[in-house]
Amino acid sequence: MRCVNRVDCSWSRPSEAYRILPSGGHLSSGFHQCPLSSLSFRSSFVCCSSSTSGPSDSNPESSSNRSYSRRWQNPLPRRQHPDQIPSSQIARDWIDSDTTPVSQALERFTVVSYNILGDGNSSYHRELYSNVSVPYLKWGYRKRLICEELIRLNPDIISMQEVDKYFDLFSMMEKAGYAGSYKRRTGDNVDGCAMFWKADRFGVLERENIEFSQFGMRDNVAQLAVLELRKSNKSRKILLGNIHVLYNPNQGDVKLGQVRSLCSKAHLLSKKWGDIPIVLCGDFNSTPKSPLYNFLASSELNVMEHDKKELSGQKNCRPTKVLETGSKSSNTITFSFCSSWTKEEIRVATGQENSYWAAHPLKLNSSYASVKGSANTRDSVGEPLATSYHSKFLGTVDYLWYSDGLLPARVLDTLPIDVLCKTKGLPCQELGSDHLALVSEFVFEPDG
């Protein structure tokens, strides 16, 4: 089954499917660990297996025709190409928050945000991957790495960007116990955003898709979903957002408008369900300390104080620039008081005809910036030094933002710059995308 034109898909999996629980993880009452015959785990997460190859790219059969047994089986087919076996493992460690209560009685859940590099984009923008061996760009190879990584992580919620083979992913994730929802970009684009959630942990109360083309903001899309924690005595709900912001650094007005619109719509939906806490995931295509990042963190921005081409900070993150200035580069933007903003650009950016101020109603914090990390992996504001690496970019553009009502209990630390540089560019033999997966475990704030 293939996507044709625009696609909005929502799937659920039969109740017989089991969760896959890694050793050392937090187990919720009522869940049982299943045998993991062909998968191995460490106390610190290993994001890549010791061997891999690409599964078939054939279309999965209709989910309605599948049968499921109670005995868990690895949803990934056997590897068949020993010449594609990774020679090493890249380890990432969990970092616990030193400020969040650690009581196991607190209800918790784990969220992943992952730009998986669309198959079409990896082919169309081949110049970005000039240092990557062709076999490691093949979707079959990368799909296996990505799915194995996610199965090892065993998150409760997954938000993906650049998804253009949704049904390939869904067939595997469904067998691992996930339900899913997909929103394709508008226009002629073939990729979009996807959400997956553990169907035995969360139920979906409401979903909303955002097409930014309806507001004159290009063909990007975003997703919102109200999820309710099952088997909770307190009717816990969260609002999950997922976005892939426009890449083009020159169109800061559109990038700002997309983020502003997502925050506004998330606020309305959260209010509708009783001011429920919010988690916003995605590739925001903006770097730490950039005006766009500061807009998310501070809730407002005077656009006339900035050049719209510098709102995202991306132009300062070419690999040669980052490596020349060192891993502690400040990504400082040279602000200019610009008269180059047109009335239409101001309207798109701020949502108003006669105001230079863009604002959003949320109080957001970044989960990674909230959990103290290592100088080898974090910048001066606490964000990862790099979440994405290809021949023209080395830096951070991916984030997990959260609102009041939630606290980050721990995050999966990213990789040091020197480790990333040894790959000469992502994806590589061990990593299936040009982005790293961001992972945060959240707890609900204790009541009163």
Curated annotation (Swiss-Prot):
InterPro entries: CCR4/nocturin_mRNA_transcr (IPR050410), Endo/exonu/phosph_ase_sf (IPR036691), Endo/exonuclease/phosphatase (IPR005135)
A GO CC term attached to the entry: nucleus
Cellular compartment(s): Nucleus; Cytoplasm
Catalytic reactions on record: Exonucleolytic cleavage of poly(A) to 5'-AMP
Cofactor dependency: Mg(2+)
Residues noted as binding Mg(2+) in the record, renumbered to the chain: E162
SUPFAM superfamilies: DNase I-like
Biased composition (Low complexity): 50-67
Residues covered by region (Disordered): 50-92
UniProt keywords, alphabetically: Cytoplasm, Exonuclease, Hydrolase, Magnesium, Metal-binding, Nuclease, Nucleus, Repeat, RNA-binding, Transcription, Transcription regulation
Transferase among keywords: no
GO molecular function: metal ion binding; poly(A)-specific ribonuclease activity; RNA binding
Pfam family, one: Exo_endo_phos
Family annotation (Gene3D superfamilies): Endonuclease/exonuclease/phosphatase
This enzyme's EC code(s): 3.1.13.4
Keyword match Nucleotidyltransferase: no
Subunit structure: Component of the CCR4-NOT complex, at least composed of CRR4 and CAF1 proteins.
Function text: Acts as a catalytic component of the CCR4-NOT core complex, which in the nucleus seems to be a general transcription factor, and in the cytoplasm the major mRNA deadenylase involved in mRNA turnover.
Protein family (similarity comment): Belongs to the CCR4/nocturin family.
UniProt protein name: Carbon catabolite repressor protein 4 homolog 3
Taxonomic source organism: Arabidopsis thaliana (Mouse-ear cress)
Record gene name: CCR4-3
